[in-house]
Amino acid sequence: MPLSYQHFRRLLLLDDEAGPLEEELPRLADEGLNRRVAEDLNLGNLNVSIPWTHKVGNFTGLYSSTVPVFNPHWKTPSFPNIHLHQDIIKKCEQFVGPLTVNEKRRLQLIMPARFYPKVTKYLPLDKGIKPYYPEHLVNHYFQTRHYLHTLWKAGILYKRETTHSASFCGSPYSWEQDLQHGAESFHQQSSGILSRPPVGSSLQSKHRKSRLGLQSQQGHLARRQQGRSWSIRAGFHPTARRPFGVEPSGSGHTTNFASKSASCLHQSPVRKAAYPAVSTFEKHSSSGHAVEFHNLPPNSARSQSERPVFPCWWLQFRNSKPCSDYCLSLIVNLLEDWGPCAEHGEHHIRIPRTPSRVTGGVFLVDKNPHNTAESRLVVDFSQFSRGNYRVSWPKFAVPNLQSLTNLLSSNLSWLSLDVSAAFYHLPLHPAAMPHLLVGSSGLSRYVARLSSNSRILNNQHGTMPDLHDYCSRNLYVSLLLLYQTFGRKLHLYSHPIILGFRKIPMGVGLSPFLLAQFTSAICSVVRRAFPHCLAFSYMDDVVLGAKSVQHLESLFTAVTNFLLSLGIHLNPNKTKRWGYSLNFMGYVIGCYGSLPQEHIIQKIKECFRKLPINRPIDWKVCQRIVGLLGFAAPFTQCGYPALMPLYACIQSKQAFTFSPTYKAFLCKQYLNLYPVARQRPGLCQVFADATPTGWGLVMGHQRMRGTFSAPLPIHTAELLAACFARSRSGANIIGTDNSVVLSRKYTSFPWLLGCAANWILRGTSFVYVPSALNPADDPSRGRLGLSRPLLRLPFRPTTGRTSLYADSPSVPSHLPDRVHFASPLHVAWRPP
């Protein structure tokens, strides 16, 4: 007969009418009983022949992905002109006095941030914008280009101008070496790029000769020179051969020749000196691509009147006859002045050699589930986290639930600050630019590659493609609608572009680490400046707490002014005042302790409503269910151990079938949530110890011992002793010498025992006491006669790695011992 829910509850000692604990609890450690219960609840039967269920409520598993929804009316968010002050350490020191070693180290990490991957894979420009929405290709292309343009205008991206130079908007940092420093700076650099000076100077010829010894493939080199691109080292990189602005077009060959000869007009003496063997008219240098000339600065030797000689793909339509009612020339002729082919930033700097490639693709999604009106750019730099050359990102400590509760559960008033575009505050060194490239190959290539018009694709490498091969009704209608949104920017956005990150991007594993270091250092400074208040951060979420509302408001004003003086942009509309219950990291934290936020409780209820019984559920769906239930597990009676059968099925990659009893058990567990309370400091006066055959307790001056009916594994025996100590004494601070009991992770014990022990020991704090000093050591070995002196072991609540009381460094700094005795648990501990 299957086990009923009531019987199962009684078995786990969750009901009050259970017998004496010393008899009942050791039974739960019995392997035979655990196996029988698992069979009764159908937990062990992992091989099932019925088809798996792949969807439970909103949770989907294998073979199904959520279809992203494209919104043609997405607004591109605006970015303030974010510029974090370079002398941030000096400004903090003016505010709070000398910084601690920790604060200084963290702030130096991000001024500027550096990124050196082992290997960088370069992808063709066509992969720059991902075809994420096949139905809305053109629309998505322009929206993404507009987003990238907005980021560039806000000083978040560099624009690659030539192989060795980039331009950007906004205020420069000292490590961004300006191009206009005069001739001296060029001698130290391996690249000769001149942004403003005239094109053929002797300086460059000197330069080229010096580099020529390294060149074997001179043919590629001559082909690379166009406009301002003086890429010398490019020949080393066979992947970086194509000129920067490449667009297949009707006049591909002719334009290319013109550009070759035109660029020779300015540099012929230099050219011939450096490359005597290379002919300027190389037939194969043009693979059907028009070379664009927007790389030339407006005041260079080429005059404005010559521009029509090298028309760009977009403007070529102006002179051609419409091929149909949907010809692109009809759109191009709507405007007389389409504006420049390219924009250049306010500052030009030197960068390491950057090929005309991208290293990651981009696409747009909704800003968040609650805001579908605005878009968010997703950058896929996952190449750095994959494969043999993956970068192992630095680990950083995040406070666990208990530490967080100890820190923040108090009778303070709270408010949270919203840092706008937090990642884009942290500057990246220009040396990282070649590794973090995004961009696009221009509209013509994008449409050609993704259109069903095979003529375009076939013509790319053979005969000259016809300009009007691109015209189609879909493209015409899309562009006409986009023309109403973007106007003459359609022309600018239809050109190829390559952008590198100037601030840290979100798609790299290094960024969360750097952001966490930055905000925690700033909060540490604020805590020392206002010792009677509390400031705490997780990523970009910063919270302030103070004793009264008036006090909090004045703290808010002072901290806001301080953050603004550092160049940190706050979003005043999103400042939230929480009163005494702080909503933070998915929890509600008040003076009673922590509970999950209401929306998570609703999600759990919804999950149980949709959870089928007696049907095998795909283990991928089980992962999603465990993710949700695991978040709230610390607030239930049995905690994580209750989810162990689910964990086991996920590990063995088998389907899981919920029996009615197990589902009812979990459902009841999650309907009544108990707050996790903050730990209080105190003295430990109750000690527990065990041997495989017996247990012993010391409570004040009272000592007890007992034996087990059969020998047990030592960890199990120690856990039982701790449970007896708690139930006998009611004390919430217990001394033990077992590291597993100390860790309060009961998932490795027999399943029923783990569930019962979690409930008995809920809210208990443990203090480590070495075996040699443990007063309960003798009773556990059956010796009650000898009485050891009672230890006075103080218990201090843990706050993880967050030091709330960092000593200001005017005191001579010495590092205190973290742990005062060789605790196996603390030695082996890694940040969660």
Swiss-Prot record:
Region: Spacer; residue ranges are 178-335
| Residue spans crossing the bilayer | none
Keyword Magnesium: yes or no?
A: yes
Entry keyword set: DNA replication, DNA-binding, DNA-directed DNA polymerase, Endonuclease, Host-virus interaction, Hydrolase, Inhibition of host innate immune response by virus, Inhibition of host RLR pathway by virus, Magnesium, Metal-binding, Multifunctional enzyme, Nuclease, Nucleotidyltransferase, RNA-directed DNA polymerase, Transferase, Viral immunoevasion
Give the recorded effect for D178E.
Answer: In strain: Latvia
By sequence similarity, the record places it as follows: Belongs to the hepadnaviridae P protein family.
Q: What is known of its domains?
A: Terminal protein domain (TP) is hepadnavirus-specific. Spacer domain is highly variable and separates the TP and RT domains. Polymerase/reverse-transcriptase domain (RT) and ribonuclease H domain (RH) are similar to retrovirus reverse transcriptase/RNase H.
**Mind telling me what this protein is named?**
Protein P
The species is Hepatitis B virus genotype D subtype ayw (isolate France/Tiollais/1979) (HBV-D)
Encoded by which gene?
P
